[in-house]
């Protein structure tokens, strides 16, 4: 069974106070349609460096924001984002295909047999460097605590990586075995591009310096003698 997180009161107040200012005609309106609001999701962001080095996910992922999912009709969606800062900010609404995918995926993940076999706390894991978002199902032990990270599940629902299957539940070990090499390859590519960019900058600086030296040399050169009248 999947449990939705408890939203901190300050996050909820930020959502309630700012939501109306961002709505457009036709958007689902929370006060008028409470059924349109789905449980909120806490989003964690995972960087490429810790992922590539197989650092423990629970130690490396950083709390980024909260999402409040809403749906007016099947296939269309809307979600609001509130940051997880000490002073939370309402950063806006997502509409269209990305929102529809997020809303539908939230419904689908709850129906997965693997998710129903144990108790989990639901959150979202965003890996911007891999253009991937996944549900992070944190296993809950008999004591009611998230006590064994090895039993967590990762379920990608948006990804640009063909090696990852959307809506397939991976153990953390399985997911890391696939994603870590991808992150390492991306980092190497970023480093190569950075080195190439720095090389071009140095070439441009050297060319500019040569021009400056040429102008200085020209400025210091003595004037040629003037022709004497006959």
Q: Where are the language model's segments positioned?
A:
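A short, surface-exposed interaction/processing loop segment used at functional sites
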Residues: 78-128, 145-228
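Exposed beta-strand-loop-beta-strand "reactive/processing" segments of non-cytosolic proteins
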Residues: 29-86, 130-143
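Short, non-transmembrane alpha-helical segments in secretory-pathway proteins
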Residues: 1-55, 96-120
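A composition-driven signal for long, intrinsically disordered, charge-rich low-complexity tracts
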Residues: 1, 67, 223-225
